[in-house]
Amino acid sequence: MFIKICGIKTVEELKIVEKYADATGVILKSTSKREISFEKAKELIEIAKIPIYAVSTVNTYDDWAKIIEKTGTKYIQIHSNMDLNEIIKLKNNYNVNIIKAFKVPSISPNPEKDAENLINDIMQYDNIVDKILLDTGKGTGKTHDLRISKILSEKIDIVLAGGLNPYNVKEIVEIIKPCGVDLSSGVEKDNKKDEELIKLFIKNLKYNDK
């Protein structure tokens, strides 16, 4: 299973995360408290042993091109309603690996209908982006309506995000069966990545592989 621990800010956090995760991420051009500068992102990307995704809510080709060129990243995670043709242009011009995030409602009165609408939206990106991520949105650290995620996971490969932590990951992954997980605040203590929480998260996640 693909494991991404996002929102690192320092070399110290990177050194911890890369021992346990398949990928990590840095937050750029965002209102998030985890936002860092292009210069810091470049520093982390250059020394990382695992892929670092540049994660942002920017929604234009020019803004993403600037991020890619300033940081040297080959991995991006798009959290916006960016025009599909501009995403294709990014892929063609920079050959970046792309995770495209889709927001799932916190609570849905009609999960089947919401899942159908999301599937129709997601299928436009088939063979264009590399991974599909389902998230609650805006790094809230809260789960979304998992009934929707379950329906989608039965039809397509998804990376699940939103409110995951060491204490709920086992049950949630058993229900949803995603191909990957992505989290940030769920393994933080005092606003920093905590190695003991990460180890516990991985232990409980791996329980599902037995």
Swiss-Prot record:
This is N-(5'-phosphoribosyl)anthranilate isomerase. InterPro entries: Aldolase_TIM (IPR013785), PRAI_dom (IPR001240), RibuloseP-bd_barrel (IPR011060), TrpF_fam (IPR044643). It holds the Pfam family PRAI. The keyword Isomerase applies. The gene is trpF. GO terms for biological process: L-tryptophan biosynthetic process. It catalyses: N-(5-phospho-beta-D-ribosyl)anthranilate = 1-(2-carboxyphenylamino)-1-deoxy-D-ribulose 5-phosphate. Its EC number is 5.3.1.24. GO terms for molecular function: phosphoribosylanthranilate isomerase activity. Gene3D superfamilies: Aldolase class I. CDD domains: PRAI (cd00405). The lineage of its organism: Archaea, Methanobacteriati, Methanobacteriota, Methanomada group, Methanococci. The keyword Transcription regulation does not apply. Belongs to the TrpF family. Keywords: Amino-acid biosynthesis, Aromatic amino acid biosynthesis, Isomerase, Tryptophan biosynthesis. Pathway: Amino-acid biosynthesis; L-tryptophan biosynthesis; L-tryptophan from chorismate: step 3/5.
